[in-house]
């Protein structure tokens, strides 16, 4: 394939951001023989695919602190990529528990693995509010499944729809919002503003609305760095600790995109902004009104991830320990957090509980803290979903492309899909020029 601009120079493409979107875009462009440079501001490639080494029980091994699992039904591009790279995976699970305060200083604990864990606290067998919650779960699954199969979904926020349908407070606070917090890493008020249609489609696609025939969840053996390293090795021109300060686009001509880093200015023919939408907007010194409207419409929830071995954050009853463990505080505006029990998510060679706590309410024992990281996740309210639909209107204009998980549901497959789509568009553009020149 020819890789020249219309002035006969070799076409240069910059990909800014080395999360799954940037990695996949740069990897596919490099494999296609194009001149691509991957530029990452941080100290490692991978973004939320962040594997760190720990030493426990006399063994040193890697654990993941961001991206953890995928399934065999809704991650087709990721599965294809892992097959292409020869990445080994192992079975994982999606068990879920809830731990939150009740009146009188009591604590509610339950988990969804089986009837024994649902009624981990036997008193709940006689609690009418708990039993109402269970009935509401079954009702919600029926209603949401019917909507998912019925075509057009109501344009309404999740919280407003729950009010219309008279779902109990216990269903919201003890089940639906905890489950959503585990999935989207955001607080309750943000989830209630989530578009009902997006929520229902996601739950349906991921098999969350039925007890049987759920997808099999898997994880990368040895940690997600095993796939990241293989992708990075296929990208000859790559840079770490190289934060981009600004991106300016010219009105035409070769190398019309000017990128500023700490090392100075560099010119490219195309730029792919494979970072969060707010970061992309901050880099565009000459952002147009349509770009500004879309990129500014998506908000982000900052999340602190603490890697530790303090099991006191998990349910008091060990039978309720799950892969994903939700906890909330007793405040009027309760704090929420999720504790990911990595021993149940990944095949770890140790018996010591290894936990990633997202926004922990109670700080883990400092002597048991292994590391801490800051992540951010997109907030999918009505404004964000509307903005996503407008991205295609200017994708590729002024030789500027946008990619990231924020263009979909916010998950790994979404970031990968967006990066591959941009790479395919650029590759097709080059092929079209080759055909025109022939």
Model-derived segments and spans:
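Mobile amphipathic helical/loop "lid" adjacent to a hydrophobic cofactor/ligand pocket
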Residues: 2, 72-196
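N-terminal Rossmann-like FAD-binding beta1-loop-alpha1 element of flavoenzymes
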Residues: 11-38
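Conserved Rossmann-like nucleotide-cofactor binding loop
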Residues: 21, 44, 278
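Glycine-rich FAD pyrophosphate-binding loop
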Residues: 30-55
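Mid-domain catalytic core of redox enzymes
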Residues: 32, 245-376
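N-terminal glycine-rich dinucleotide-binding loop that anchors FAD/FMN and/or NAD(P) in oxidoreductases
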Residues: 52-78
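Conserved flavin/dinucleotide-binding core of flavoenzymes
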Residues: 53, 113, 333-438
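Helical element adjacent to the flavin cofactor pocket in flavoenzyme catalytic cores
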Residues: 201-261, 266-269
């Amino acid at each position: 394939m020819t890789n020249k601009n219309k002035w006969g120079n070799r076409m240069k493409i910059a990909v800014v951001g080395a999360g799954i979107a940037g990695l996949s875009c740069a990897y596919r462009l490099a494999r296609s023989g194009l001149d691509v440079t991957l530029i990452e501001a941080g100290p490692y490639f991978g973004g939320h695919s962040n594997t760190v080494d720990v030493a426990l029980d006399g063994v040193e091994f890697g654990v993941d602190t961001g991206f953890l699992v995928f399934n065999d039904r809704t991650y087709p591009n990721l599965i294809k990529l892992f097959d292409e790279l020869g990445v080994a995976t192992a079975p994982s699970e999606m068990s879920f528990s809830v731990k939150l305060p009740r009146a009188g200083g009591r604590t509610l604990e339950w988990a969804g693995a089986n009837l024994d864990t649902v009624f981990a606290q036997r008193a709940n067998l006689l609690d009418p509010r708990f039993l109402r919650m269970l009935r509401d779960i079954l009702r919600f699954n029926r209603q949401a499944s019917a909507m998912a199969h019925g075509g057009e979904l109501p344009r309404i926020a999740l919280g407003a729809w729950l009010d219309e349908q008279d779902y109990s407070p216990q269903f919201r606070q003890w089940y639906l919002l905890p489950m959503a917090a585990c999935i989207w890493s955001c607080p309750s008020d943000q989830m209630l503003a989530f578009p009902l249609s997006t929520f229902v489609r996601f739950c349906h696609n991921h098999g969350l609305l039925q007890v049987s025939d759920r997808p099999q969840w898997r994880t990368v053996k040895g940690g997600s760095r095993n796939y990241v390293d293989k992708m990075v090795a296929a990208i000859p021109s790559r840079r770490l600790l190289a934060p981009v300060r600004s991106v300016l686009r010219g009105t035409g001509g070769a190398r019309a995109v000017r990128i500023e880093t700490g090392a100075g200015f560099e010119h490219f023919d195309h730029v792919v902004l494979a970072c969060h939408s707010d970061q992309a907007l901050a880099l565009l010194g000459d952002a147009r009104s349509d770009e500004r409207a879309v990129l500014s419409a998506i908000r982000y929830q900052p999340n602190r991830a603490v890697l530790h071995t303090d099991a006191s954050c998990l349910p008091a009853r060990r039978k309720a320990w799950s892969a994903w463990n939700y906890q909330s505080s007793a405040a009027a505006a309760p704090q929420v957090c999720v504790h990911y029990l990595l021993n149940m998510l990944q095949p770890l060679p140790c018996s010591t509980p290894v936990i990633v706590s997202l926004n922990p309410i109670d700080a883990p024992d400092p002597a048991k803290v292994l590391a801490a990281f800051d992540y951010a996740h997109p907030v999918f309210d009505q404004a964000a979903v509307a903005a996503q639909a407008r991205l295609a209107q200017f994708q590729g204009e002024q030789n500027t492309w946008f990619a990231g998980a924020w263009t979909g549901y916010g998950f790994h497959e979404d970031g990968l899909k967006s990066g591959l789509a941009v790479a395919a568009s650029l590759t097709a553009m080059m092929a079209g020029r080759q055909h025109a020149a022939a």
